Amino acid sequence: MVKRPVAALALAAVASAPAALALPAQASAAPAASASPAAAASAKPAAARVDCAKVKCIALTFDDGPGPYTARLLDTLKKHKAKATFFLVGKRVEERRKLARRIAREGHEIGNHSYSHQSLPALPDFELTEELSRTQDVLRRAIGRRPRLMRPPYGHTDARVRAAAGRLGLAQVLWTGTTLDWSLRDTRRIGDTVLRLARPNGVILMHDVVPQTVKAIPRVLRELRKRGYHLVTVSALAGPGRLAPGASFPR
């Protein structure tokens, strides 16, 4: 069954990766370094080549990376000339900064998925903001710019989360369908689930830290192409004016 982000938050709890990452003992207070021109240029998402108001589009999104299987996923996306959106965890970007740069360089979109993958509504205001702002700074150092999109871990959100995101210039992105790939752990079933959830203007939630998901993507891309879909980033799918700071997409 398609799980929609406008449903009760209880549904969202099963949609994201299993465990929160442990915070290090101290948060970094270092200011963001100035990005080189090359890094800043590589961080710009590819311009939309299609008008999703006129053609059939879908956005594949991947949470919780970068991880050990992200490079293979990027190889597959490049081979099939498909774009995707990656919601990255700040702590993991620090561990795999080159992968984050590659995601940006190859024209995919990058979003903020918090620093340590905690449920944001459960945090006091300062810690909630720190989870997002620290990741903004990590990504600024890694790819030369701060993202404009965020996705709350587990899909847990409320008015405080949206307000904090808005103050940091971030729009919230949820989904129209989740594969529950982290629990399925089966290549065929994950692929079948994506294809069942696919619909025009859909936003599909997956995880590039799940190896079976990465293995499923070649078949998914081939089948979606056969169905006439353009594989685009969330921003290309949303179009102008729908991803303002503090906004939530899809509605």
What are these regions (language model features)?
Residues 1-35:
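Secretory targeting and sorting signals
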Residues 29-47:
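Low-complexity, acidic Ser/Thr/Pro-rich repeat tracts that form intrinsically disordered stalk/linker regions
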Residues 41-138, 239:
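Active-site beta->alpha N-cap acidic-glycine motif
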Residues 45, 49-52, 80, 93-94, ...:
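C-terminal domain-boundary segment and adjacent tail
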Residues 55-57, 80-85, 105-109, 145-148, ...:
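Loop/turn elements at helix/coil->beta-strand transitions in domains of secreted/extracellular proteins
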Residues 62-64, 87-91, 114-115, 151-155, ...:
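Active-site-proximal beta-strand/loop segments in catalytic clefts of secreted hydrolases
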Residues 63, 77, 86, 110-113, ...:
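Conserved, mostly hydrophobic/aromatic
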Residues 118-146, 154-202, 213-216:
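Alpha-helical scaffold elements lining the catalytic groove of polysaccharide deacetylases
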